[in-house]
Amino acid sequence: MFTIRHKGLRISPSLSATRELMKEGKTLFDVLEILEKGYDAPRKRKHGIIEKWINKGNKTYNVVVAEDYDDIMKEDIWKLIHFGKFTRRRIK
């Protein structure tokens, strides 16, 4: 079965994150690109949670994933808990 993996763990979106991806017209391949090529967010997160940002044009996309365990597949996964976009502003 074909799955998208980051650091050896499968990426599985939550229901709300799936809705956020659909709203922006993005896929898990875009999430993987942000996780691999993006930079760390300026704010701190708990241990086991990763937040990455990537700039595209005047927009910044952010991804938040947390380490989790999938009871059905019996494996550790990255649970996508947030996907967002915001506009960067120039500082005057």
Regions found by a protein language model. Name each.
Residues M1-K92:
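Ribonuclease/tRNase effector modules and their secretory precursors
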